[in-house]
A protein has these predicted regions:
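Conserved acetyl-CoA-binding loop-helix of GNAT-fold acetyltransferases
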Residues: 87, 93-106
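Conserved catalytic-core motifs of GNAT/GCN5-like acyltransferases
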Residues: 68-71, 117-119, 123, 129, ...
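A conserved beta-turn-beta hairpin within the catalytic core of GNAT-like acetyltransferases
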Residues: 70-82, 92
Length: 140
């Protein structure tokens, strides 16, 4: 595997591969710099959000978001929600998505989440099962 660094998203990453990485899910790189910085600051100020990036040669090539939800059940426990797992097309199938997800799962555990969940399309179920997720429900 290539040498990757997994770390928290920084403002300088927005136009250094981060938004382009999200393009593998849905077009994000056309977001204006002003709007991108506004969204970054809003998310960064919310302690329940964490965005990790995968960096190779100083360029962001992948990303994943974790949202932590406080619950009344489970004695006021927390649930982690994985969102926006994205890797730039030319870096896919190199284990990068897996590493970023695993890093956020570790963070969720450290934050006391009693479980971490995600939604995905059927073609991605096998990818997440390899990481340790279990399929619970599928829409008809």
């Amino acid at each position: 595997m290539v040498n990757i660094q997994i770390r928290e998203l920084e403002e300088k990453d927005l136009f250094n591969g981060f938004l382009e990485s999200l393009d593998s899910l849905r077009k994000a790189s056309d977001l204006s710099p002003k709007k991108a910085k506004e969204v970054f600051k809003k998310i960064k100020s919310d302690k329940n959000y964490k965005i990790y990036v995968a960096v190779i040669d100083s360029k962001v090539v992948g990303t994943t978001t974790l949202f932590i939800e406080q619950k009344f059940i489970h004695d006021g426990g927390k649930v982690g929600h994985i969102e926006d797992v994205a890797v730039r097309k030319e870096y896919q199938d190199k284990g990068i998505g897996k590493e970023v997800v695993k890093a956020l799962l570790g963070y969720a555990k450290k934050e006391g989440c009693y479980k971490t969940i995600l939604d995905c399309t059927d073609d991605l179920i096998q990818f997440y099962e390899k990481i340790g997720f279990k399929k619970v429900f599928s829409y008809p």
